[in-house]
From Swiss-Prot:
Inducing factors: By phosphate starvation, via the PhoP/PhoR two-component regulatory system.
Superkingdom in the source lineage: Bacteria
UniProt-listed PANTHER family: GLYCOSYLTRANSFERASE (PTHR12526), TEICHURONIC ACID BIOSYNTHESIS GLYCOSYLTRANSFERASE TUAH-RELATED (PTHR12526:SF629)
Pathway where it operates: Cell wall biogenesis; teichuronic acid biosynthesis
UniProt-listed CDD domains: GT4_TuaH-like (cd04950)
Protein name: Putative teichuronic acid biosynthesis glycosyltransferase TuaH
Alphabetized UniProt keyword annotations: Cell wall biogenesis/degradation, Glycosyltransferase, Stress response, Transferase
Name of the gene encoding the protein in the UniProt record: tuaH
Protein family: Belongs to the glycosyltransferase group 1 family.
Leading EC class: transferase
The enzyme's E.C. designation: 2.4.-.-
GO molecular function: glycosyltransferase activity
NCBIfam families: TeichurnBiosyTuaH (NF047676)
Length: 397
C-alpha cells in the first residue's frame, strides 16, 4: 500500500486563535486541514500584543499556535507585522521547528489568510504558498481616512503585493477581491479563484433546542438580529433611526464590541428596543438564531465593504431565517424574494421596507426549506475541498 507524504500546514492569521471567541474563515480552514488524513499538523502563526509563555501552544486538536510579539502594544505600531526588519528574527523558532521536515520526507505548505509577515514566504523552501484573501486589507474598516490610515494602507498594500506575486494559488472570498487581485498581476491570473464564505450547515440547520426568551427581556413581536463581531464597518446610525421608527421591533445584537468606543453604537444601545448580549460562545450562536425573525447585515457604504461577503449570510439561511443586507455589493446576486433582500444606501425607510418585505412569508415552511437548500450548497467542507483542488496539494500527497 502506498504511503502518503505527511504535510505540515502553516497558516498566517490575523490574531490569536481564541481572540473574542469568534470563528472566522481562517479558523474553519485550519480545522479542515487538521482533519485531513495526510496532515501531520497545522501551525497557526499570528501576531500577539504580548510575549507568550511558550513558543508553541496547542489551541485545538492538531493545531499549534506560534505567536509573534508585536513591535509595541498600541494599534498604531501594528505596521511592524508587515515590515521585515521588525519581525524577521522573531520567526527563527518557527523555522527551526520546520527544518527537520524535508529530511523526514514531509511537505510544508504556507497559507496566508492576511498579508502579515510577507518575508516568511522566502525564508523556507515551501512546497506550496497559498493566499486565501478574505478582506480588502489595506482599506480602513471604519471608512474614514487620515494620515495614519494612509501610511497603514501603503505598508499593507506593499506586503500584500509581495504575497500575491509569490503565491502559487490564490482564493478570494468575493468577486470584488478577485478583480482587485487580478489588477496586481501582470501574468498568472489563472491561479486566482473565487470561493465565497460558507457555513457549518449541520450546526445551524439541525438546532432543535428551544431558545432562551429571557434574553429578550420580556419583549414580544418581531426580532431583528445581528450576530458577529460588532465593528465600525456597521451602520449604527441607520439602525438607530430604524429602531426609533419601529419601536415595536426588537433589535438584538450578539457579539463582542470591537467598535473602539464608537459613539453611534453607544447611542444605539440607549434605545429601549435595542438589546446587546455581549460575546457568545460559537456553539451557542445557533440558539440565538432561533430568537430572531430576520437576520440583518447593516453595513456602511465604504471601499472596505465593497469587498465583504459576510459569514453570517449563509448561517442565517441555514437556520431558515430571511436576511436583509445593506451596502454589500458582493451579495447582491443572492437576492431572492423572502430569502434575501439587498439595499443600497443608508436610508432607514428603505431598510425597514426590505425587512417588511421578507416578513411577508414569515414562518412559511416552504421558504424556510428554500433558504436551507441555498445554504446547504455552501457547506465549508465542500468549499475547502474546492480550494484544495485549486492548490493541487492533495494530488501530490
Amino acid at each position: 500500500m502506498e504511503t502518503k507524504e505527511a504535510i505540515i500546514h502553516v497558516i498566517v492569521a490575523t490574531a490569536e486563535w481564541g481572540k473574542d471567541q469568534l470563528r472566522y474563515r481562517r479558523h474553519r480552514l485550519a480545522e479542515f486541514l487538521a482533519a485531513q488524513e495526510e496532515t501531520k499538523e497545522v501551525i497557526w502563526v499570528c501576531p500577539a500584543p504580548r510575549a507568550q509563555g511558550k513558543e508553541f501552544q496547542e489551541v485545538h486538536s492538531g493545531i499549534r499556535q506560534f505567536a509573534v510579539k508585536d513591535l509595541l502594544q498600541k494599534k498604531m505600531f501594528r505596521f511592524g507585522r508587515y515590515t521585515d526588519v521588525f519581525y524577521r528574527h522573531k520567526l527563527s523558532p518557527l523555522l527551526d521547528e520546520l527544518t527537520p521536515a524535508s529530511a523526514n520526507g514531509e511537505r510544508c505548505c504556507l497559507w496566508y489568510t492576511f498579508p502579515g509577515f510577507p518575508l516568511l514566504s522566502s525564508l523556507y523552501s515551501w512546497d506550496q504558498v497559498i493566499y486565501d484573501c478574505s478582506d480588502l486589507w489595506a482599506a480602513p474598516i471604519s471608512g474614514r481616512s487620515n494620515l495614519l490610515s494612509e501610511f497603514r494602507r501603503k505598508v499593507i498594500k506593499s506586503a500584500e503585493l509581495r504575497i500575491i506575486q509569490r503565491a502559487d494559488s490564490i482564493t478570494c472570498s468575493s468577486d470584488y477581491l478577485h478583480k482587485e487581485v487580478d489588477k496586481k498581476l501582470t501574468a498568472g491570473r489563472e491561479k486566482v479563484h473565487t470561493v465565497e464564505n460558507g457555513v457549518e450547515y449541520e450546526l445551524f440547520s439541525a438546532n432543535k433546542q428551544a431558545p432562551d426568551r429571557s434574553i429578550l427581556q420580556g419583549r414580544e413581536g418581531i426580532v431583528l438580529g445581528f450576530i458577529g463581531g460588532i465593528k465600525p464597518k456597521l451602520d449604527f446610525k441607520m439602525i438607530k433611526e430604524a429602531a426609533l421608527q419601529k419601536p415595536d421591533w426588537t433589535f438584538l445584537w450578539v457579539g463582542p464590541d470591537a467598535t473602539n468606543g464608537d459613539v453611534s453604537f453607544q447611542e444605539l444601545l440607549r434605545l429601549p428596543n435595542v438589546i446587546w448580549t455581549g460575546p457568545a460562545d460559537p456553539k451557542e450562536v445557533p440558539h440565538y438564531m432561533e430568537l430572531i425573525d430576520i437576520g440583518i447585515m447593516p453595513y456602511k457604504q465604504s471601499p472596505y465593504n465593497q469587498a465583504v461577503f459576510p459569514l453570517k449570510l449563509f448561517e442565517f439561511l441555514a437556520a431558515g431565517k430571511p436576511v436583509v443586507g445593506t451596502n454589500l455589493p458582493s451579495t447582491s446576486k443572492m437576492q431572492k424574494p423572502y430569502v434575501y433582500e439587498y439595499v443600497e444606501g443608508d436610508h432607514p425607510i428603505d431598510f425597514i421596507a426590505a425587512c417588511e418585505k421578507v416578513l411577508g412569508q414569515n414562518g412559511d415552511e416552504t421558504y424556510k426549506e428554500m433558504r436551507r437548500n441555498i445554504a446547504r450548497t455552501q457547506d465549508w467542507n465542500c468549499l475547502f475541498r474546492q480550494i484544495m483542488k485549486y492548490t493541487g496539494i492533495q494530488k501530490h500527497a
